[in-house]
């Protein structure tokens, strides 16, 4: 068990580095659920970070976990295998998440393409975590889990548009609707047209956060505070971006430790 504990700790460190808001929200869970959540989100981060040459090997290792034939020695596979067995997780959202990493890097035409990407990544992550967050009412809470994950993915997207990959995901039809040009995008221009484009997408993220908020009473006591914290923290990221005039090309927006403590003290 010492090896498993160390494997979980390694996963926790990864989540703390790449998704500090989620890490803070997960801190309210009981230890078993918290550790399993670290393993799941570490899986997501590793898959999302893998280049196309490495992804097939990653996918093959994941298949061994699904089939209960894992013998991986790395901390991720030890922790993920243990979490997968302990909480009887299903393979489908993990497969969906990996498949989403293989998509072409072409620019998105419309909002539906961005929402589908967010569903296949963030929404899938929500479904991965659902059996960890609740043993009962999973059918009733399925949409809430998807909505939370989808919203978080959109917030992460909206908080850092500095890379070519992220710029490609801004729906071109939405840009055209508000008069934001391709030249503006490539220069990282923040003007009224960009602000309206950003807010159009942010409205979707906030609507999904609200959907999850409505279902909050259905979550068990042990996970309610985690879900509530995630909702508040990701709303706060959007508000911070607004306060800084939407300059998401130059800066990656994240909450400071002081801001996180203040937000969590109010929930």
From Swiss-Prot:
It is an enzyme of class 3 (hydrolase). It holds the Pfam family SQS_PSY. Diphosphate release from FPP is inhibited by zaragozic acid. Keywords: Hydrolase. Its EC number is 3.1.7.6. GO terms for molecular function: 15-cis-phytoene synthase activity; hydrolase activity. Changing residue 47 to D: Wild-type diphosphate release. This is Farnesyl diphosphate phosphatase YisP. A farnesyl diphosphate (FPP) phosphatase. Involved in biofilm formation, its disruption blocks biofilm synthesis which is restored by exogenous farnesol. Releases diphosphate from FPP, was initally suggested to be a squalene synthase. Diphosphate release is higher from FPP than geranyl pyrophosphate (GPP) or geranylgeranyl pyrophosphate (GGPP). Biofilm synthesis is partially restored by exogenous squalene, beta-carotene or retinol. Required for integrity of cell membrane lipid rafts. Monomer.
């Amino acid at each position: 068990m010492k090896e498993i504990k160390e494997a979980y700790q390694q996963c926790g460190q990864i989540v703390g580095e790449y998704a500090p808001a989620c890490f803070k929200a997960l801190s309210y869970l009981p230890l078993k659920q918290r550790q399993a959540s670290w393993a799941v989100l570490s899986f997501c981060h590793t898959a999302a970070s893998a280049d196309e040459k490495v992804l097939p090997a990653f996918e093959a290792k994941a298949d061994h976990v699904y089939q209960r034939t894992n013998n991986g020695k790395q901390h991720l596979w030890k922790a993920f295998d243990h979490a997968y067995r302990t909480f009887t997780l299903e393979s489908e959202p993990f497969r969906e998440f990996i498949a989403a990493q293989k998509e072409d890097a072409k620019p998105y035409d419309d909002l539906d393409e961005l929402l589908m990407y967010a569903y296949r990544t963030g929404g899938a992550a929500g479904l991965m975590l659902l059996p960890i967050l609740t043993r009962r009412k999973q059918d009733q809470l399925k949409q809430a889990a998807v909505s939370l994950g989808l919203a978080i993915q959109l917030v992460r997207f909206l908080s850092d548009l500095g890379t070519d990959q992220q710029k490609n995901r801004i729906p071109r039809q939405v840009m055209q609707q508000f008069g934001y040009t391709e030249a503006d995008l490539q220069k990282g221009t923040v003007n009224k047209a960009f602000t309206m484009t950003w807010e159009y997408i942010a409205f979707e993220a906030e609507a999904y956060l609200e959907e999850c908020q409505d279902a909050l009473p259905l979550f068990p006591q042990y996970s309610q505070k985690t879900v509530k914290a995630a909702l508040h923290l990701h709303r706060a990221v959007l508000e911070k971006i607004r306060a800084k005039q939407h300059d998401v090309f130059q800066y990656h927006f994240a909450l400071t430790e002081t801001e996180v403590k203040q937000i969590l003290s109010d929930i």
